[in-house]
Amino acid sequence: MSAAAGKTLADYKAPYPKPTSRQRRYVILLDPKGDNAELNDYKVELIPGRVKLLDGANHYFLGGKIEEKTIDGWGYPYYVVTLAEMAGTAMLPLGNAAHKKLRFVPLHTSSLYRYNSKLPIVVYVPKDGVLRYRIWTAKLSGRGKAKSIKAKEM
């Protein structure tokens, strides 16, 4: 069982803002990896987006941004996501992929953030959005790997 599995945001006793009526708050609790490893070998990629009914051929993405803010007097970071409407698509021919299905459409750009198991990663996403994330690790061979995970709304 993960060391972070039983924790909640309240355990950190920090005054994170409540989500507005137009937001969802996601909290990512990370497993300890050791201070040196967390600083040098691990990163977190935040992947906000929306689930939309779309064809299966094209590659869609959203405009928007992730803004880092800080809890006054605490120095703890949190992130606020703004999602725009559909920013673009590859416009591939449809053929057999014309059938529409629900697909995750990510924010056009993504960034890597510090892996720090001592603090939660708190992300506010528009009500119609969802958050996914990846944990990136550096391997001695020089080839990194990532695992995509759905974030938990709290």
Swiss-Prot record:
Pfam families associated with the record: Ecotin (PF03974)
GO molecular function, one term: serine-type endopeptidase inhibitor activity
Superkingdom of origin: Eukaryota
Family indicated by similarity: Belongs to the protease inhibitor I11 (ecotin) family.
The name this protein goes by in its record: Ecotin-like protein 2
Native source organism of the sequence: Leishmania braziliensis
Lineage: Eukaryota, Discoba, Euglenozoa, Kinetoplastea, Metakinetoplastina
